[in-house]
Amino acid sequence: MRCRIARAPALGLLQSISTWGNLAAGAIGMGIGLAATLPFGLKPWQAMFIVGALPALMSVFVLAKLKEPQKWVDARAAGLAKGIKFGSYKNLLTHPRWSRNAWWALIACSAGIIGLWGIGNFHPKIVGSIVEGEAAARNLTGPEMASHKAFWRSAGLLFQNIGGFIGMLSMAKLAQTWGRRPAFALALLCSFLSTVLVFKFMRQTTDMYWMLPLMGFGQLGVFGVYAVYLPELFPTSLRSTGTSFCYNVGRLLAATAPFTVSKITAKLGGDIEGFRTAGLWVSLVLLLGIAVLPMLPETKDQPLPEE
């Protein structure tokens, strides 16, 4: 019983901590942007790629120490003895109940992922245009302009993820108190409204201080609901499979968003205003996510489903 009560808060906290890496990246990027020169003639983005590779090496040692939970090991052994296949995409996509949950959740998740990965994470393009305009009056040289833009783009990432951390914690908490579907709907609505705010109205660097945290709150807050809700839609034999399907296929679908934004931008003249408008049009997909939520079950205060 204690594990059941703690599961949702723990998942929400774990998901929110994912922003810490982005916060660190933003702070490091700001430091690189402030540096007068970089070693080996590196450009700011090249230095960030090198720094970003280090955690991947660290994760190898961490993963080597992680072990499967004993409860999962026992459940898998018991399931296999009964002939239950674990991790079967065939079972996931052909079972009447689980396939229904998988497909509708995929649509809802894809909407939120497109909002972040396909639209919101391209806010540095807007930041760059703002910084260029404000820095032109200062007669900065080419290298100075590059460092200035790198600083503010990294600052934007920092602001976004401060809001994202709070958003994930808040939406995960609301999912526990209001219910999964109401929290999901609110998170998608916040994502949509905050995207409109940034893409239409962010025009000065001072706007970044409050608009980007709001966008991070909305767009990343959706992921706090994913962490709590998705595992509750599938049985033990398909829990990670179903969650992975909804999230990772959603990421593949989100990969089409930048191409769509690019095409719309080109149709609208190819300038920054065209890009802003394109982002606004594509953000309408977030409303589709809200529209399909009634097709999914409410799982608040329900035991995890089983075969």
Where are these regions (language model features)?
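Transmembrane-helix signature of 12-pass secondary carriers
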Residues: 1-307
